[in-house]
Amino acid sequence: MASGQMAPSLLRRPITFVSSCPPALRSFGALCPPTGSTDLIGGTGRDILIAAAPARRAPLHATLPLLRSLHTSPAPQLSASHQHQAQQQQQQTKQPQQPYDPQQDQVPSTSTASSSKPAADPVYNLPNAVSVARLVSGPLIGYWLVQGHYEAATLALAVSGASDWLDGWLARRLGASSVFGSYLDPLADKVLIGCVAAALLMNGAMPGWVAGVVVGRDVLLVAGSFVFRLRGFGWRWPGAAAFFRTVDTSAAAAGAATGAANGVASGGGGGGEGVSFMRPLLISKANTVLQLLLLGGYLLRGMDGGAGLQLLLPGGGGEELIMGLELATAATTVASGLAYGTMAVQGKLFK
C-alpha cells in the first residue's frame, strides 16, 4: 500500500467525541458543546480528512424541566409575627437548659384548684381571741357572784358585753370572718349569760322563770346549730377540724360534698361549704343586748342592798325598769327562738 494512501479499514472508522460536561447535562446540547461522531474519509500522509456529523441537540420539551429544577426560588417573606416567633426560638436555643425539677410535674389537687373559697379558715386571729376571752370570762364572773363580789362582777360583765360588739367589728374590719368564728361568737354569749344567770339564780337575785326562758332558749339554739351543721356531713362526725373548717383535710372536702348533696336533696342548705356560716338574726342581737342589760340590773340591785341601782337611777324607778327588761327579754327570747326554728326548717339557718 502506498504511503500516501490510508488503509481501507481506516477510511470509514468513526471517531466519537467525548464531552467534558456532567452526565446529567451531557445529552442537552443547549447547555454543553455539541457532541457527535465523525468519519475518516481519507487523507494522505499525516493529513486526515474528517467529515463531522451534525451535532445532536436535546429537544426543547426535555430541556425545560431541567431548567426549572435548576432554578432556585427566592426565600419566602415572613410576617412580623413569624419573625418574632423565630427570634424567640433562637433566644430559647441560646439559653442554658435548666435542671429537671420533679416538683414541676406534680398536678395540683382538683378540689383545691376548683374551689372558689379557701379550703381552710383562719382560726388564730384577733376577733376569735376576743370571743374566747368573753367565753372564759363567764365562769369567772359567775364565781365572783357566788363569792359576793358584785362590784368586780359588774365591771367584768360590762367589759365582756362590749366585747360582743368588738369581735364582730374586728372581723368585718380585718376581713377575718370564719366558720369557726360564726360558732364561737354566739357560743361565748351563751356561756357568759348562762353562767351569770345561774349564779344569780343561786343567790336568789333572779326569778326562776326568767332564768329558765333565757338559759333554755340558748341551750336549744346552740344544740340546734350543731345538729344542723352535722346534718350537712351526712350525720357523721367528720372531726372538729373539718366541722369548723379550720384545716384543709380530705374529710372536710368529703363532708362538703356530702353536705351539698344533702342540701339539694332536702331543698335547703345543710351546712356544707357553700352554706357553712351561722346566720345571726337582728332580733337575736336585740335579745342579747336586753339580756345583758337585765343581768346588769340584777347585779346593781344586789350590790350593797341596791346601792348600785340607786346610784344609776337616783330618782327611783329601778324596780320598774327591771320589770320592763324582764318582759322585753322574755318576749324577744321566745320570738328569736321561733325565728331560728323557722329558718332551720326552711334550710336558711346557715349562709
From Swiss-Prot:
The chain crosses the membrane at residues 139-159, 191-211, 251-271, 280-300, 321-341. Catalyzes the synthesis of cardiolipin (CL) (diphosphatidylglycerol) by specifically transferring a phosphatidyl group from CDP-diacylglycerol to phosphatidylglycerol (PG). CL is a key phospholipid in mitochondrial membranes and plays important roles in maintaining the functional integrity and dynamics of mitochondria under both optimal and stress conditions. Cannot catalyze the phosphatidyl group transfer from one PG molecule to another to form CL. Its EC number is 2.7.8.41. Keywords: Lipid biosynthesis, Lipid metabolism, Membrane, Mitochondrion, Mitochondrion inner membrane, Phospholipid biosynthesis, Phospholipid metabolism, Transferase, Transit peptide, Transmembrane, Transmembrane helix. It is an enzyme of class 2 (transferase). PANTHER family: CARDIOLIPIN SYNTHASE (CMP-FORMING), CDP-DIACYLGLYCEROL--GLYCEROL-3-PHOSPHATE 3-PHOSPHATIDYLTRANSFERASE-RELATED. One of its GO terms (cellular component) is mitochondrion. Residues 76-120 have a biased composition (Low complexity). This is Cardiolipin synthase (CMP-forming). GO terms for biological process: cardiolipin biosynthetic process. One of its GO terms (molecular function) is cardiolipin synthase (CMP-forming). The keyword Calcium does not apply. Its cofactor is Mn(2+). It is a multi-pass membrane protein. InterPro entries: CDP-alcohol_PTase-I, CDP-OH_P_trans, CDP-OH_PTrfase_TM_dom, CDP_ALCOHOL_P_TRANSF_CS. It catalyses: a CDP-1,2-diacyl-sn-glycerol + a 1,2-diacyl-sn-glycero-3-phospho-(1'-sn-glycerol) = a cardiolipin + CMP + H(+). It comes from Chlamydomonas reinhardtii (Chlamydomonas smithii). Its main location: mitochondrion. Residues 74-120 are annotated as: Disordered. It is found in: Mitochondrion inner membrane.
